[in-house]
């Protein structure tokens, strides 16, 4: 997808990191940044390849995730070590979502029991 505003043009590529062979989709490409949506569901090889492809000076990474365990590799290496990686860590809870009613929040909480509660 190509987006132009004024004299600036950006090209966006969309890939999935669903399995171990996914890293090959982006191998060899030069990127100025990546947005990895639900990064905890992606394979580590895809994530590491995406980060390695960000070779333009000033490249940025954006992640969002809901790791299923405090032992998840992404949680261990990025969330817990965000300061060492010069990363901004922002945490949100269900209650932070202004579009969710209290009834919906309670329903979600009753459906999803996890170690995070």
Regions found by a protein language model. Name each.
Residues 1-117:
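Short, flexible loop motifs at catalytic/binding sites
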């Amino acid at each position: 997808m190509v987006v132009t505003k004024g004299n600036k043009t950006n090209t966006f590529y969309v890939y999935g990191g669903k399995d171990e062979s996914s890293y090959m989709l982006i191998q060899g490409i030069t990127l100025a940044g990546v947005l990895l949506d639900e990064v905890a569901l992606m394979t580590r090889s895809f994530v590491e390849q995406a980060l390695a492809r960000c070779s333009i000076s000033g490249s940025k990474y954006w992640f969002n995730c809901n790791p299923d365990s405090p032992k998840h590799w992404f949680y261990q290496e990025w969330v817990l070590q965000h300061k060492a990686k010069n990363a901004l860590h922002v945490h949100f809870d269900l209650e932070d979502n202004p579009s969710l009613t209290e009834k919906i929040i309670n329903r979600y909480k009753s459906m999803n029991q996890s170690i995070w509660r």
